[in-house]
Amino acid sequence: MAAGIRGRRLSAPLKPRPIASDAERFGYFKAGKMGLGWLVECDNAAQAETLRAAYPTYATLVPAYLSPYKGVYSSTFVRLPFPVFKEDWEAIESGLKQAGIQVPDKVRNMGHEAIRRAHERFLLSKLPNFGADAGGGYATGFLRDGYAPLPFQGVAIEYTRKMGYRGIIGDDMGLGKTMSGICVLFNASQGRKLIVTKNSLTPSFYARLKEWTGKTESEMAVAVSATGKARKGPGKHPGAHPEWLGLKKYNVPFDADIDRYEVLIVHYAILKKWLPRLLEWKPEAVVFDEAHTLCNPDSLLTQSARRLSEQVDSVVAMTGTPGSNRPRELFHLFDLVFPYRFGDFHHYGLRFCDAHLVKQPRTVFNKETGQRETKQVEVMDYDGASNLKELFYRLRATGMVRRLKNDVMAQIPFEDIPMVLPVSDEYWAQEEECVRKVQEARSKGETESLLSKLLLLAAEEKIKWASEWIPDFLENRNGPLVVFFHHNSVGDALREFARGKGIKTMCLYGNHKDDDFEHRFQTDEGVELALVSYAIGRDGLTLTRSAHMLLLEYSWVPGWIDQAKDRLRRYGQERLISYYCPYLEGTTDERVVECVVKKKDVLSAVMDNRSDTVLPHFGSM
């Protein structure tokens, strides 16, 4: 068909012309009752009839009075609509093939784009309105007087209820997912209920349940790995009481009778050990708190959680960072709550993880030579990201509710303060030597330990600066300072330094875990410094007595940094929060930050349908 024809009627008939290629057969048509679609020019009336008869549901012959070539080809044009579903497009393409017409790439691409847009509109129509009040479809009678979920929390409860009490509550950190999870738990079941969380958060969950629902020690307990059997040694006797075992009164040993409890709280470290007992106990509803812990399908922990979720009617996962690192993690979290909702992982990876074959070095044993050799082998790489908007819609429409702080509450102001640190000649020499070793080891696939050494070198260099900056900061600022880091050796160095300066310090890292850390930090005005590692203290804690945080090291996982920062940016915080972000310019330390910012931009597109502008120096961290 001639270019430029858009369904207009010609004033005079044109003579027949030869069709040079299949690409000339297709014209974009939009006019009156004809609607939107392709107008396909056929060689003759017989071919047009063959095309129309191949699928009468879709194809129509163009009436003579609407033919672009008036009076010439009145019956050799066939109108095909833009497809809405993949099956429609396959039927249209099959019919064209039967008529001897090949579909040009341009037409095929436009067809696929039409399908994508139609699918996006369909998903958008199913997207729940998370900003509206949910109404009164759920019960709150189990809560004590004076306690009730906020309207936006009610939306999450109602949405999960409509999904059959299965769902992912992915609200931003600090938005009260604990209240939402407890309400879903008690709405879903009148019988036994299970909460699985991190060890450091079990006392907090127990306290909230007791405060909000009025449950007593006879109705709920926290599971521990210890047993009630007698121990060897003087003064030890059988029939031990929990107090004798060094346990709190609400703890229940592994070999205790748990049938009398309505609510049981188990932490992830002992889930595998407790799994047989929990399956016998037969809970009717389970909440997985901090569910991003369950994103590794090969771990025994995730496999135990999967076995448990398959035996329970109601399963709710709660996490402020549903995708801590890459889109591939979302599949395993969704598959835990909604088995097979996304099909198999490989097809998910092809669609949303930009899966492709890459060559990687692998050490293999050569039987002929009796030695180990390094070979390049092809493996499937699922670490990428693709079709993020479609993934966002599918997540929201099929089981996940997520709101950011700015969506549901007055914005808590905060600022990222980048701090460029001087780099010593000694550090430059050490980094140069380490980089050289990394390049040599790259072909052998042995770079991981050397990269860790590079990061530790940067951390040690920043400790020298921190030992001068922290005392000046505490002297001139109001309120305590929270320091986050990755390596335990960094915490040890800061702890010894603070002790020498007489700075009252609390620790939560490695082997240094102060009892009742959160409560003491929030109430003891004498505490000036808190040393916290990402591994232990990045989630669940409320540290709103401080409005200042020093991110001395950066995690490879952007979700960990967000979790750490949200220890201060929570309900109850009324001051401007300052995050101090020191980095060694031009070094590996700065390149780590660039990598983390790019990762976070991808995750923002998936989880929140937005792509943050990557600002220089921590603008979107």
Predicted regions and their residues:
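SF2 helicase motor core recognition
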Residues: 178, 271-276, 323-327, 490-495, ...
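A conserved SF2-helicase RecA2
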Residues: 556-621
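Conserved P-loop NTPase motor "coupling/switch" region that bridges the ATPase
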Residues: 190-193, 211-217, 221-252, 260, ...
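Conserved helicase/translocase motor-coupling segment
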Residues: 406-504
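Charged, low-complexity
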Residues: 5-6, 10-17, 27, 38-42, ...
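Conserved helicase ATPase core of P-loop NTP-dependent helicases/translocases
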Residues: 252, 480-484, 492-495, 499-537
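Conserved Walker A/P-loop ATP-binding site and its immediately adjacent core
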Residues: 180, 191-211, 324-329, 486-488
